[in-house]
Structure formats: structure tokens, C-alpha cells
From Swiss-Prot:
It is found in: Endoplasmic reticulum membrane. The keyword Endoplasmic reticulum applies. This is Seipin-1. GO terms for biological process: lipid droplet formation; lipid droplet organization; lipid metabolic process; pollen germination; regulation of double fertilization forming a zygote and endosperm; seed development; seed dormancy process; seed oilbody biogenesis. Keywords: Endoplasmic reticulum, Lipid metabolism, Membrane, Transmembrane, Transmembrane helix. GO terms for cellular component: endoplasmic reticulum; endoplasmic reticulum membrane. The keyword Membrane applies. Knockdown mutants have a reduced accumulation of oil per seed and a reduced overall seed size. Residues 344-368 are annotated as: Disordered.
């Protein structure tokens, strides 16, 4: 029963429902629909012409780009040639600069290396000088001083000193009768103290009377001509000493007659010979002095070049740094220009490709 009542009530409501009135803007809607139809018809009719115009514009842009590329090619070629010449010139200047720096570094290394080796290596002392014995003394003596020369010198500490005397003695009757005499050699310090002493007997070589006569007969012509003489040369290894503190400043040689006699030998000339021998390490360094100079200079040269490369690279390669900076700036400018051209081209394309057709919904919204 309730269901039937509901149905009857709904039917009565439908019968009593008031119809909706007509819209007030129905005229504007009709006008809008007609305008859209006209616009779409015009777009469809004019689209071939727009397509032709766009293709024409694209052809014009392509031709202009080709013309720009053709015009830019000689400038790029000229710029490339100038760049090649500039780089060649910078390369020559850089090579000259690097060569000059390397030569200066080599000279500096050689000077320092030779100086270091000269400071370490000790040259053996070799001295040969005349001695003059003072026969006014009871025992004639002669002194050789290391400060006598124009340039004073001394024996380095650690060297072995060998002192020798060379006596040129005539074969006179007095020297033959004397026979043996004593030779004393002393090393004196700066204060006059005796550092080392050596004394040994000396005598002429014995020659019998027949030998002397035969020799005189055979050598008569050279003796008369003055080419030969009747004399003997005696070399005496007098003293050997290890140099240490206090330092040696002079060498004194003294002639002492035989015991119970006062006759002294006759001398034509006397010489002193001093030779020093360094320790074996410094002796080896002295023998290989130039090799040490070469190797020390090479090591220093490598060290100087390494220091220049690590700490003073602009001094060694000044043109490279300036060239890299200029090239980087030019590259940045070119990149910026290319980006600007790409942005402008992209904007042009976006403007050309903007849609010129509006849909029906947007038009209806604009009118409403």
C-alpha cells in the first residue's frame, strides 16, 4: 500500500512541476558559435598560404645562415693563420727563454758544484826550493818558511809530510876526507817550537883512485868543454811526519860535522823538496776531482730545475701561462656568444611555432 501511495505522489509532483524558463544569453551563444565556425573556416582556407609562408621564411633563414658561414670562413682562415703565426712566435720566444733559463741554471750548478768539490778536495802540497846554509855558524843551518812565498800556504791537517834534501857536492879532497857528516831536519811551529826532528848520516859515494882517473880520461873532453863536471848529487829522505795541531810553519836543516872533527862538507847547491800525501779518501777524491765536479753539478742542476718547475714555473714558462689565460678568455667569450645565438634562435623558433588557432572552449569562456 505504501509503495502505491509513493508512486501516485511522484506522478502528481511531475504533473505539477513548473517548466524552466529560456536562458537570457541564448542570442550571444548563437553569435559565438557562428563566429567560431567562421574563424575555423577562414583558418582552414588560409592554412596553405601560411604553410607556404613558413617554408619561405625557413628557406630565407637557411640561405642567410649559409651566407654568414661563407662570409665568416675567410675571417676564420685569417684568424687561424694569425693564430698559427702567433703560436709559432710564442713557441720560438718560449724556447729561447727556457734555453736561457736552463743555461743560467747549468752555469749556477757548475759554479756551486765546483765550489763544493774544491772546498772538500785538498790538493797535495808539492814544494821545491833552494836552501842557503849559513856557514858563519858553528853548525850551518838553513830555514825554509811556508810564508816565504808571495802566496803563503801550509800543509793541511791529516796529510803525511815527506821532507827530502838534494845536495849537489863537488868531489873535492875535503869532501872525500870528511866522509860521513850528520844532517838534521826539524819541523818548527809558529812559536818556534820543534814539532818533529830527524837526524841521519850522509856521505859521498866512494870511488877509488883508478876509477876516478879512468873516468877523468874518458870524460876529459866534456869536462874541458864544461858539459860535465866532477860533482855528485845526493838525495836524502830526511823526515816523514803526520800533520796535526800545532801546524808546521817552517823547516830547518842543519849540517853537523862528525864527532871530534870540525870540518864541514862543501856544497855547490842545496834544495828542499816537500811532498804531502792526503788521506786515502781525500786522495781518491782528488784523483777523481773532475768526475766529482761533473756529477755534483748534474745533481745540483736537476735539483735547481725541479725547484724551478715546482716553485717558480712562471719564471720558466711565462708565455705558456699568459697564452693559456688569453685562450681560456677567448674560449669563454666564444662559448657565451654561441649560447646567446642559440637562445636567440630558440626564441625565433618558438615565436614562429606559436599556435594561431583558438579552440571553441576558450572562445566561449572569453565571451561568457
Amino acid at each position: 500500500m505504501r509503495i502505491l501511495q509513493n508512486k501516485t505522489m511522484k506522478e502528481q509532483d511531475n504533473q505539477l512541476k513548473i517548466p524552466e524558463p529560456l536562458r537570457a544569453d541564448w542570442f550571444m551563444v548563437l553569435v559565438t558559435i557562428q563566429a567560431d565556425l567562421i574563424y575555423n573556416a577562414l583558418v582552414v582556407l588560409s592554412s596553405p598560404f601560411f604553410l607556404l609562408y613558413r617554408s619561405y621564411r625557413r628557406a630565407v633563414v637557411t640561405v642567410s645562415a649559409a651566407e654568414k658561414a661563407v662570409k665568416r670562413a675567410p675571417a676564420q682562415i685569417a684568424g687561424g693563420a694569425g693564430r698559427v703565426v702567433r703560436r709559432t712566435w710564442f713557441g720560438i720566444l718560449g724556447a729561447c727563454h727556457v734555453s736561457m733559463v736552463m743555461v743560467l741554471a747549468l752555469i749556477l750548478a757548475v759554479v756551486i758544484g765546483v765550489g763544493i768539490v774544491s772546498l772538500y778536495v785538498e790538493k797535495p802540497v808539492v814544494v821545491r826550493d833552494r836552501l842557503f846554509f849559513d856557514y858563519t855558524e858553528e853548525n850551518p843551518s838553513a830555514v825554509f818558511s811556508f810564508d816565504k812565498k808571495k802566496r803563503s800556504f801550509s800543509v793541511p791537517v791529516g796529510h803525511s809530510v815527506h821532507v827530502s834534501l838534494v845536495l849537489w857536492m863537488p868531489e873535492s879532497e875535503i869532501n872525500r876526507r870528511i866522509g860521513v857528516f850528520q844532517l838534521k831536519v826539524e819541523l818548527l811551529s809558529l812559536k818556534g817550537e820543534t814539532i818533529a826532528r830527524s837526524s841521519q848520516p850522509c856521505m859521498l859515494r866512494f870511488r877509488s883512485k883508478p876509477i876516478r882517473l879512468a873516468r877523468t880520461f874518458v870524460m876529459s873532453v866534456p869536462l874541458i868543454a864544461g858539459i860535465a863536471n866532477e860533482a855528485q848529487t845526493m838525495r836524502i829522505d830526511a823526515l816523514k811526519h803526520q800533520e796535526k795541531m800545532p801546524r808546521t810553519k817552517a823547516v830547518r836543516a842543519t849540517l853537523i860535522p862528525r864527532a871530534q872533527t870540525r870540518t864541514l862538507p862543501q856544497l855547490y847547491e842545496a834544495e828542499i823538496v816537500i811532498n804531502s800525501k792526503p788521506p786515502w779518501i781525500k786522495r781518491m777524491a782528488y784523483n777523481w776531482k773532475w768526475t766529482l765536479c761533473v756529477w755534483t753539478s748534474m745533481y745540483l742542476y736537476v735539483a735547481i730545475l725541479t725547484a724551478l718547475l715546482w716553485c717558480f714555473r712562471p719564471v720558466l714558462f711565462p708565455y705558456t701561462s699568459s697564452r693559456t689565460i688569453s685562450e681560456s678568455e677567448n674560449l669563454e667569450i666564444e662559448v657565451v656568444e654561441e649560447e646567446q645565438e642559440q637562445v636567440m634562435e630558440r626564441r625565433r623558433r618558438e615565436r614562429r611555432n606559436q599556435p594561431r588557432r583558438r579552440n571553441f572552449a576558450t572562445t566561449q569562456k572569453s565571451y561568457t
